[in-house]
Regions:
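Active-site helix of classical SDR
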Residues: 52, 88
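Conserved mid-core segment of classical short-chain dehydrogenase/reductases
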Residues: 2, 24-38, 81-84
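Conserved hydrophobic beta-strands of the Rossmann-like cofactor-binding core
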Residues: 18-19, 67
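SDR active-site lid
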Residues: 101, 105-172
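Residue(s) in the substrate-gating loop at a strand-loop-helix junction
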Residues: 72
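A short helix-coil junction within the Rossmann-fold of NAD(P)-dependent oxidoreductases
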Residues: 11-12, 28-29, 54-63
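Conserved amphipathic alpha-helix within the SDR
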Residues: 1-13
Length: 214
């Protein structure tokens, strides 16, 4: 990332806006391999850190700049059936908050993008790709409020950046979910358990797949 940033700055000049967008999803819980959890940590968290390290010094020297970091609604609400995705996207949101707090006075502005399902190749490219599974191909748990197009997400992002708005929620329902979670965590957890039961009505629940690690 550092070399890429240096090349772009050399060829085109200072970077005003850096969009940090990479990710993949897996379906596993505590039984997932350490190596897979670590890989997701590298992609969903450390990649944002590497990017910030690469672009912030020059942005600050130039009087400011903008980071658009893609996280996920899972970072605010959790992802049923995927431990690694849930915890790394939560960390990505926290990282964006930290950068905004720490570097705001230096002219750095941050937005964190937290969509649900978007029509991309993230599921097709997943190491757990279940091609032929209708539920998987329809977007899985994240598609409960519909799948939106990348162009729609881009429009929402441009509007948010023009307003210097931190939290970008292309699926408007997520705002209500996060408010309900903050107001009543116990009811929210109960509702998520019931949602999980509905999702896996004819198959084992994710927790039933955990092996004995002792």
């Amino acid at each position: 990332i550092r070399n890429m940033v240096a090349t772009i700055e050399h060829k085109h000049g200072p970077i005003d806006l850096f969009c940090s967008n990479a990710g993949f999803v897996t379906s596993a819980g505590l039984e997932d391999a350490n190596e897979r959890i670590q890989k997701m940590w590298e992609v969903h968290v450390m990649a944002h850190i590497y990017a910030a390290r690469a672009v912030l010094p020059q942005m600050i020297a130039n009087g400011g700049g903008y980071l658009l970091n893609t996280a996920s609604a899972a970072g605010l609400l959790t992802q049923i059936g995927s431990l690694s995705y849930s915890i790394t996207k939560s960390a990505a949101v926290s990282l964006a908050e930290w950068i905004s707090i720490t570097h705001y006075h230096q002219g750095i502005r941050v937005s964190v993008l937290c969509p649900q399902a978007v029509r991309t190749d993230i599921l097709t490219n997943s190491p757990d790709n279940r091609e032929g599974d209708p539920e998987w191909e329809d977007g899985g748990v994240a598609s409960s409020d519909g799948i939106i197009e990348p162009t729609d997400v881009a429009e929402v992002c441009m509007e948010a950046i023009s307003e210097e708005r931190f939290m970008i929620l292309p699926h408007r329902q997520v705002q209500g979910y996060t408010e309900f979670k903050a107001e009543n965590p116990e009811k929210w957890l109960s509702g998520m358990r019931k949602f999980q039961d509905r999702l896996f009505i004819d198959e084992p629940l994710p927790g039933d797949l955990m092996q004995d690690f002792r």
